[in-house]
């Protein structure tokens, strides 16, 4: 049976009933490199996907394709993208493995009890496969397991209540008959021990309690509404201004300038809302981002977020001039940039060759903005949605990062935060998409994707990639071109001839380093700025 995609991320979690004889572990002291080599030896690899998995003095296993390690060189993640041709079976002992996902991969067989050896596993997703048999009790001994997704399989029985097991997110069976105890035989009065009059009394009491509870809630809500109604009338038209622009800004002036948020003045749509051009006067033009009120738990949270960002100022960040917030309307007021966004710039540059110094300037400006958010803001600011449409340009090709104002803020003692996945498909870092754990290295990954788009004629998920296997993106394409000795063909038309080839290749390698799976290998944005400044064109 040919196993698609990431089948062998599952290691020793299960054995296929029709697979070959599994390899055995050589002992408790088996090193990760030896374990990976054993895994490779059990595969049929006609396309040489694992050709870099060779034990020699020039590199260690942490640099092999698809392998990510921690600071102790222990394997913590294995993502084999584009490995549809791998075939075989194997057992691998990786005690530090923390994340394993293989959904919709046509996996069969049973889950082996040796799953209990993965003491560091946090995410285990085996949904929509063809797994059978019973779920081994060893799974419930995995103390660090946070996410378990087994739905869409053919297991016997269902999930039982297990003592001392606390999962942050448990997704188990769909369309199963044995989730929880059956109640088919427990509905008769005889077995319940209750007479009809007793049942009627209980139901009546429950209804009375429910009605009283609703009345109390309505009473409290009504009092709160009356107490705040006058305040709302006074505040509904207020605009908080951070920057003195020489003219008064009122709610009526801004809303009228947007044409009352008419479609003709709409200049962009994003995850937080739509942006409108507001021309108050010929010399005072603003961009007004109208937010979806439901994204915030009331205007108090909104005020808290904005007040924390009031001092976030950098030459390459779009300037926040002011805002309005009430229970029915929220919008931010930014300076308007007439050069459009980077997404449109990339689409339209085919009409004329773009000089290397212009592309370099844009790349450096964005890197500086991100470095400021990550390194100089306290608490640090994570953007979480770096993409070309969130990078604005003026008429001199100066680049400005937008939409940072509503990203999550981290305390100084935190290096990451667990939250729902924000961002745009194609730009989201793989570890963020898989575990919802985001750090500044997720922004670095997104920056690498944007950098590849900036220097090439490809999009993150270019239509031309459809002929390749699932998961093939601009990173896969750039690696493929390099491996075939076609680095020159990565760059947009005319760029190789006008830009110094050595500098262009350095930027290409920077983009690929920003998009590696291993967080420890990805550079910081401060390091990216340092490299870009070193190869800065002499004439700007």
UniProtKB/Swiss-Prot annotation:
Disruption phenotype: Decreased sensitivity to ABA during germination, growth, and stomatal closure. Impaired central domain protoderm patterning defects, and defective cotyledon primordia cell types. The keyword Membrane applies. It is a single-pass type I membrane protein. Residues 261-535 form the Protein kinase domain. GO terms for molecular function: ATP binding; identical protein binding; protein kinase activity; protein serine kinase activity; protein serine/threonine kinase activity. Induction: By ABA (at protein level), dehydration, high salt levels, and low temperature. Residues 1-19 form the signal peptide. ATP binds at residues 267-275, 289. One of its GO terms (biological process) is response to cold. Residues 20-198 are extracellular. It is found in: Cell membrane. One of its GO terms (cellular component) is peroxisome. LRR repeats lie at residues 118-142, 144-169. Gene3D superfamilies: Phosphorylase Kinase, domain 1, Ribonuclease Inhibitor, Transferase(Phosphotransferase) domain 1. InterPro entries: Kinase-like_dom_sf, Leu-rich_rpt, LRR_dom_sf, LRR_N_plant-typ, LRR_Rcpt-Like_S/T_Kinase, Prot_kinase_dom, Protein_kinase_ATP_BS, Ser/Thr_kinase_AS. SUPFAM superfamilies: L domain-like, Protein kinase-like (PK-like). The active site is at 385 (proton acceptor). Belongs to the protein kinase superfamily. Ser/Thr protein kinase family. This is Probable LRR receptor-like serine/threonine-protein kinase RPK1.
């Amino acid at each position: 049976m040919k196993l698609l995609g990431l089948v062998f991320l599952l290691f020793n979690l299960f054995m296929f009933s029709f697979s070959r004889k599994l390899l055995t572990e050589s002992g408790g002291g088996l090193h990760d490199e030896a374990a990976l080599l054993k895994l490779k030896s059990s595969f049929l690899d006609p396309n040489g996907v694992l050709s870099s998995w060779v034990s020699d003095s020039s590199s260690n296993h942490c640099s092999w394709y698809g392998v990510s390690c921690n600071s102790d060189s222990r394997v913590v993640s294995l993502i084999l993208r584009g490995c549809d041709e791998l075939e075989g079976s194997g057992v691998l002992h990786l005690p530090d493995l923390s994340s394993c996902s293989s959904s919709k991969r046509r996996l069969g067989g049973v889950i082996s009890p040796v799953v209990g050896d993965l003491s560091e596993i946090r995410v285990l997703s085996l949904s929509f496969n063809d797994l059978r048999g019973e779920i081994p009790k060893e799974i419930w001994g995995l103390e660090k397991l946070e996410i378990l997704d087994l739905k869409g399989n053919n297991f016997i029985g269902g999930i039982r209540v297990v003592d001392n097991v606390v999962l942050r997110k448990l997704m188990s069976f769909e369309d199963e008959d044995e989730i929880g105890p059956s109640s088919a035989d427990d509905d008769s009065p005889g077995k319940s021990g209750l007479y009809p009059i007793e049942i009627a009394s209980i139901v009546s009491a429950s209804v009375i309690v429910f009605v009283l509870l609703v009345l109390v809630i309505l009473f409290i809500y009504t009092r709160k509404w009356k107490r705040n109604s006058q305040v709302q009338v006074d505040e509904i038209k207020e605009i908080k201004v951070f920057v003195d622009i020489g003219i008064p800004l009122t709610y009526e002036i801004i809303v009228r300038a947007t044409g009352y948020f008419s479609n003709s003045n709409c200049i962009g749509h994003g995850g937080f809302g739509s942006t409108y051009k507001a021309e108050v006067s010929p010399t005072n033009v603003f961009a007004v981002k109208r937010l979806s009120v439901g994204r915030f738990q009331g205007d108090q949270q909104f005020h808290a977020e904005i007040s924390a960002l009031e001092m976030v100022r950098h030459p390459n960040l779009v300037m926040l001039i002011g805002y309005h917030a009430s229970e029915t309307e929220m919008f931010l007021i930014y300076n308007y940039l007439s050069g459009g966004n980077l997404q449109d710039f990339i689409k339209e540059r085919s009409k004329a060759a773009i000089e290397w110094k212009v592309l370099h300037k844009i790349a450096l400006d964005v890197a500086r903005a991100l470095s400021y958010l990550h390194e100089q803001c306290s608490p640090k600011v994570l953007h979480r949605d770096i993409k070309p449409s969130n990078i604005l340009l003026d008429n001199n090709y100066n680049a400005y990062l937008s939409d940072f104002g509503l990203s999550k803020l981290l305390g100084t003692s935190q290096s990451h935060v667990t939250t729902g996945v924000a961002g745009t498909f194609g730009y989201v870092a793989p570890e963020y998409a898989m575990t919802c754990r985001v750090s500044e290295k997720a922004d670095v990954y997104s920056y690498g994707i944007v950098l590849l788009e900036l220097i090439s004629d490809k999009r993150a998920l270019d239509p031309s990639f459809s002929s390749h296997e699932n998961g093939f993106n601009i990173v896969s394409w750039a690696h493929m071109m390099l491996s075939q000795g076609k680095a020159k063909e990565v760059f947009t038309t005319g760029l190789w001839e006008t830009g110094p080839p050595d500098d262009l290749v350095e930027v290409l390698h920077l983009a690929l380093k920003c998009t590696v799976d291993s967080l420890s290998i990805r550079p910081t944005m401060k390091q990216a700025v340092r490299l870009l400044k070193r190869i800065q064109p002499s004439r700007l």
